[in-house]
């Protein structure tokens, strides 16, 4: 919608400040540990390859990555204690929120999330309460050049892709079925595209437009609070903000 920005777009522009970098590395390290359960060689473990790519994109030191692989592949045991859990809830203005966590204690994680929601005008809901407002899909980010859209369209005809978005003149996001992530990014590479990032994302099917500054700020405060929790690996919301709003 013209004059509005989705939360997913806002997140792309948020820099990782030094105070949050340590927590980010911890979360990325835990993702690597879990992925390494299936094998320590990235060449034969797509999940591990994906986790390592995310870590490198965030400038995580190679020594941290190697240590996480060693722990997850059986040399430390920590990875075996972690499990993926999904939570759903509502924020101010009817905003729907999906949270993916990696935890060794479900009760602790649920309590932390419930507190973050309640302190910021939202509430933690039951599984399925907002999932119908999202589509879990594969997304691959590639490097593009001015005038390359026609070539991209031709490439996608041969791939299992559902569509694309031009983020600017230098990058584009290709999306497709959830189960087709590995084939999609491999296919793009084979077509000669420079693949930068790839992963699974919760894309919104219905957005909530917020035009009130106070409500918008409350929504962003909630999302920031959720993202700051140690067990949280990703936060998705169907928030759409008026670009004219002046918020922090």
From Swiss-Prot:
Q: What is this protein called?
A: Probable transcriptional regulatory protein Syncc9902_0542
Q: Which NCBIfam families match?
A: PRK00110.1, PRK12378.1, YebC/PmpR family DNA-binding transcriptional regulator
The UniProt keywords, alphabetically, are:
Cytoplasm, DNA-binding, Transcription, Transcription regulation
Query: What is a biological process (GO) this protein takes part in?
Result: regulation of DNA-templated transcription
Record's superkingdom? Bacteria
- GO MF term list: DNA binding
Which lineage? Bacteria, Bacillati, Cyanobacteriota, Cyanophyceae, Synechococcales
Per the UniProt record, which residue ranges are transmembrane? none
User: Subcellular location, in the record's words?
Assistant: Cytoplasm
InterPro entries tied to this protein: Integrase-like_N, TACO1_YebC-like_2nd/3rd_dom, TACO1_YebC_N, Transcrip_reg_TACO1-like, Transcrip_reg_TACO1-like_dom3, YebC-like
For this record, the Gene Ontology CC terms, alphabetical, are: cytosol
User: So what family is this one in?
Assistant: Belongs to the TACO1 family.
